Amino acid sequence: MKSGFVSIIGRTNAGKSTLINSLLEEKIALVSHKQNATRRKIKAIVMHEKNQIIFIDTPGLHESGATLNQLLVQSAIKSMGDCDVILFVASVFDSTKDYENFLSLNPQVPHIIALNKVDLTDNATLLKKLSEYAKFSQHFKAIIPYSSKKKSYKKGLLDEIVKYLDKHEYFYDPEFLSASSEKELYRDFILESIYENLSDELPYSSEVLIHRTKDTPNLLILEANIITDTNSHKGMLIGKEGATLKRIGKDARFKISKLAQKKVLLKLFVTVKKNWQKDEEFLKKLLNDEN
C-alpha cells in the first residue's frame, strides 16, 4: 500500500484540470479555456489498485506582474515543496521552453512529464516532441504521452506515479473523490458557469464568494456573491432583465445538484469591488480561506 501527494504543474491551460477529471472520471477540478481558471489548489483523490494518490491542481505557471498572478504563481511554487512527486503537464503542441522555465525553479522532488493532448496529433509529431524532451532526460523520471479523452492512457500514468510514492497508510477515506471542501467545489462550479456563459466577452475579472450554505436532507441552499471590478462588468454578468445571471445560475445549479445528489436552491448576487485583483489582503483570503 502506497499513499502520497502529487502536485500538478504546468503552463496555464496545459490541460491540468482536465487531466485530473479524466483520472477521477468525475468533474472535480475547474475546467475552462480561460487562463488561470484554477485559482485554488484542488485536492483530488485517485485510488489506483491498492494505492492512494492525492493530486493537487495548482494555478498555471506564467509570467505577469499583476498582484493576483504573482500570488497564483507563489501558490503553485509552494505546492511543489509540499508534495512527494511533481507531475509536469505540457501539451504536445507546446515548446519545451515552458519545461525549461519549470526547471529554473529548481524542483527538489522527483518529477514526471505528462505530454498531454496526444490524441490531437499524429505519431510523427509525437515522436518529434519526445525527441525534443530527450535532452532533458537527466532531470525527469519519465515522460508519458497522455490523452484525457482516452481511458487507455490512464493506467500507464498512474503506474508510473506510484513508483515514486512511499509506503504509507491512506491519508483520506478511499471513498472520497476530493479532500477539498464541498463549499470550494460549489464555488468552482459557479465560476465555471460564468466562463461558459460569457466566454471572451468578460475579461478575467470575476471571483465567487459563497457566504451562506444550508444543507438539509432533501435541499441544499446556497447564497453566493459574484465579485467583479466595474459596473459595466456587473451589467454583463446580470444581462438584460437578469437573463445572463439566471442562465449562469441554472447551469451552476445543475452541476452542484449532480455533485450533491439533491435539489439545489442557488441565489446569486453581483458586487462591484474595484481593483480587487490588486488587493493583496482580499486575494489572500480568496486563496487561503478554504485550504
Swiss-Prot record:
Stretches the record annotates as G5: 146-148
Binding residue positions for GTP: 10-17, 57-61, 116-119
Molecular function terms, GO-annotated: GTP binding; GTPase activity; ribosomal small subunit binding; small ribosomal subunit rRNA binding
Location of the region described as G3 in the Swiss-Prot/TrEMBL record: 57-60
Stretches for region G1: 10-17
Region (G2): 36-40
Keywords: Cell inner membrane, Cell membrane, Cytoplasm, GTP-binding, Membrane, Nucleotide-binding, Ribosome biogenesis, RNA-binding, rRNA-binding
InterPro entries: G_ERA_dom, GTP-bd, GTPase_Era-like, KH_dom-like_a/b, KH_dom_type_2, KH_sf_prok-type, P-loop_NTPase, Small_GTP-bd
Cytoplasm found in the keyword field: yes
Region feature G4, mapped onto this chain: 116-119
GO biological process: ribosomal small subunit assembly
Domain KH type-2 span(s) in chain numbering: 186-274
PROSITE patterns linked to this entry: G_ERA, KH_TYPE_2
Domain Era-type G: 2-167
Subcellular location(s) per record: Cytoplasm; Cell inner membrane
Domain of life according to the entry: Bacteria
Main location class: cytoplasm
Record GO cellular component, one term: plasma membrane
Quaternary assembly: Monomer.
UniProt family annotation: Belongs to the TRAFAC class TrmE-Era-EngA-EngB-Septin-like GTPase superfamily. Era GTPase family.
Role this protein plays: An essential GTPase that binds both GDP and GTP, with rapid nucleotide exchange. Plays a role in 16S rRNA processing and 30S ribosomal subunit biogenesis and possibly also in cell cycle regulation and energy metabolism.
NCBIfam families: era, PRK00089.1, small_GTP
Protein name, UniProt field: GTPase Era
Organism from which the protein derives: Campylobacter jejuni subsp. jejuni serotype O:6 (strain 81116 / NCTC 11828)
